[in-house]
Amino acid sequence: MWFSWNNTEQSIAVRQGYQVLAEYQLIEQEQLKNIYVIPSYASALHWFGVIFIHSGFYAGSMFRFSIILPDNFPNGTSLPTIIFTTTCYHPHIRPQTQSLDLAPFFTGWRKDHYHVWHLLKYIQAIFADPEGSISATVTPSGDRVCLEEAYNMDALAMLSNDRVAFIKKVQELALFTKKHMYDKPTSNDPHYIVIEPFCSERHTKIMEQLKSPSWKEATSMDTSPPAQCLARIDSSRQMDEEEAKQSAKLFAKNGKAAAALQ
């Protein structure tokens, strides 16, 4: 009996691993810019993430975050947990825990409707249009009616009543994130995203490897096991890329991020 139960548990874990891999492949298909995630080596349910912001109130910021998927993911209705490991000042981020409020868009998880890339677009949306993210409704005259409650009430009040002070505060944090961009990794997980200054010598070497026939042959084999590699980002190049100004609001008039995420 124990042997049968153990095999069942193992098969569930394997199936879940393939489902998580499928989520990662969907993210690649979306081709999201300036936001990067990867499942940790230790657990497929714990993802490392980083977002670079080039425009708006948070321009120049770099925030790290973790995505914790529920144990029964993608089944059930429990929402994933998103924790920022870089200090963020935002109405939807709880100051004590740095956890992100998903309620403005997600009422519950539905595997046939939501994917991890929806979470990433939501993260992008709240930083791209923080004012839109706190709008509960819009009056016929076009005035926004702000939410009455949020994870960070201080940030909500400041953004609603003193826009200049809010921008000043988040820009101070942006400078802080730049200063600590190259700090040593806080995790020894092989998949932890490491950010290093752009190195032309390393870049050239990698490009030559990609052109190599032996490299193409090795990476095209479907049976190859996943490599234990350290994810790296050449941040100088990423930070120099300027995003085009958004042509439409990321939030629907009801204050929810539906327009940005569908």
Swiss-Prot record:
<protein>
    <recommendedName>
        <fullName>Protein crossbronx-like</fullName>
    </recommendedName>
</protein>
<dbReference type="InterPro" id="IPR016135">
    <property type="entry name" value="UBQ-conjugating_enzyme/RWD"/>
</dbReference>
<feature type="domain" description="UBC core">
    <location>
        <begin position="15"/>
        <end position="179"/>
    </location>
</feature>
<comment type="similarity">
    <text>Belongs to the ubiquitin-conjugating enzyme family. FTS subfamily.</text>
</comment>
<dbReference type="InterPro" id="IPR000608">
    <property type="entry name" value="UBQ-conjugat_E2_core"/>
</dbReference>
<dbReference type="Pfam" id="PF00179">
    <property type="entry name" value="UQ_con"/>
</dbReference>
